[in-house]
Each structure stands twice: as structure tokens, then as C-alpha cells.
Amino acid sequence: MGRKRGRDIDGWLILDKPLGPTSTDMVNKLRWAFDAKKAGHGGTLDPLASGVLPIAFGKATRTIPYIMDATKRYRFTLTFGESRTTDDLEGEVLATSPNRPTDDQIRAVLPALTGNVMQVPPVFSALRVGGERAYDMARAGRPPELPPRPARIDSITLVERPDANTAVFDVQSGKGVYMRSLARDIALACGTVGHISVLRRTKCGPFDLSHALTIDQISLDKSTQTVDNADALPAPLLDAATALVDIPALAVTDAEGRMLVWGQSIDPADLVHPLPASSQGEDHLWRAMIGEHVLGLCHVRHGRLRAARMLENHEFFGEHDVDYRRTPHGTDF
């Protein structure tokens, strides 16, 4: 296999994704602009959605799963009176209704849609059915019957009513929640039909719009590069560990850090800075830190502290030419 082309660049760029392109389009565009060897994103936004799209480079891609699992916030406009094949503006009209709910009627249905609920995904989604993408089946005239899936919706707030036909909502939710489905379900619960006409993600894990850059704020024109600025990045990046700031920190010594990096386990009782007794369960993650520097994530498994996902390797400690195949336990670098 040939060596990946590009530079070793590490960090997060938080993009304010514009309407139109897919999330993958934006990753590819920015990977090219940064000449990065490795890039990925922290949660898909539909082409007709805008807002916070975290894009990871290098080491930061190791933290993508924690951003995907993180809490997210959205603001969307629900247009009443038309249901559509895609549950957004892009689709064809399926049904119409003259009913327009009042503010009180809308607020009355929101509690039943909040919490741990079952949600039917949009037919036009990337879910696989028998190896095929649901949206491919729908476009081929074979829309699949998608079963309800568990969804966690923390809060739904009616923000404003621009007019009788529309309502604006602010939503906080867990991973994998479809705002198009939620908009559809709000309308149905109100005795009418509807679809999303505007969708914007305002927060994704620790990242919000205050961190985000528009595509116009990123230097994409490589023709302006000179010998003097060839290594300059098109935009500044956030540290790779920024994605982990919501995870509790655990101070470790150099010796303990080396053990974790090498894939060796540690008896929690032997730690210089012990774990709280109430936090030694296997569902707890910790940021292993030496001073202010994050080595990576660790957790307790089978009674011992082990690496879960490391950002650093032996080179952080000034060690070189290490053969990990000869270590007692491999780890993920």
C-alpha cells in the first residue's frame, strides 16, 4: 500500500457549514486546502443544513467517536401544511393539511416527544437496509419501511412563531436523532403535517458557533502561496484534545503515562493520584494528563486502569524506534 499523501497536521477546525454541500464534500475540500494526510468529520449535516461541523485532522481523528456521541443543539423551522418525501424542502409534496396549530397546542405535545423515545428515521437517510442505503432505495422507487429506533431528546423549546405556517424550535439531543423526523412528528402530534424548512446545528459536544469559521474565513487559494508561507495553515486549528474537555481529568506521573502509552495496565490502588472510589466503574472515562498535556483516554477494565484511546505515543517521552509488536499489550496509536 502506498504512503498517504499530505502533511501530518493535528487538530480541529470547526466549520460553519454552508447550505448545499455534503459534510464529506467539506472534509475533502478542507483536506485538500490544508494538504492534510488524514481528515474526518464529527457528525453528518444534511446538504440543506448549516452550522457547526467539526472537522478533525491527524491525531484529532482518534477523538471523533467522542464527538459523535456528544450532546448536540439544533435550531430549526417547521413549516406546517405539507409533508414531503424527504421531510425537508428538497422532497416532493406527499400530503397537505389546512390545520395550523396554536402555540398552546404545540407546547402541549412537546413533553411526549422529549426524553428517551422511539423515532422512525426519514426514508431519505443513510441507514442501510439489506446492504443498500435507504435513500438509494427511495430514489429507485422502493422506499423501505424503517423501524423505530431509540432516540434521546433532552429538550424541545418553541422559540418563536414567525407566522401561522411556521414555528421555530431549539432542540438539545443525543447522537443519531433526526431533526427531520422530529419536525414531522411534532406536526403529526398537532393534528397536521409538516416538514423542516430551515435547519442549523448550533453546538456539537464542546464546539459551538463561537468556535466556527465560515468557508470565506479560510484561505483556500493555493495560488497565493510562496516559499515563505508554504507551511502556513489556511486557518488556525484547535488542539486535538479539545474534543475531550468534557471528560474528567486524571493526573498521571511520567512513569504511569509511559505504562498507559505502552498498553500496560495499572492497579488503581498504585496511582499517585488515586481515582475517586465512586468513579472506578467500567463506564467511566478519564483524560490521562501530565501537567496540562493530554496523553489520551483511559478507563478501568477488569479492575485495572488501561488505555482506551491514546493521542500520544512513545515519542512524547523522547523514545524512538520502539517496536510495539514486542510490548506485552498493544495499544491504539
UniProtKB/Swiss-Prot annotation:
The free-text function statement in the UniProt record for this protein reads:
Responsible for synthesis of pseudouridine from uracil-55 in the psi GC loop of transfer RNAs.
Which residues of this protein are catalytic?
D46 (nucleophile)
Q: Does the keyword Isomerase apply?
A: yes
Q: What is this protein called?
A: tRNA pseudouridine synthase B
**What EC class does the entry list?**
isomerase
CDD domains recorded: PseudoU_synth_EcTruB
EC numbers: 5.4.99.25
Q: Which gene encodes it?
A: truB
Q: Which UniProt keywords apply?
A: Isomerase, tRNA processing
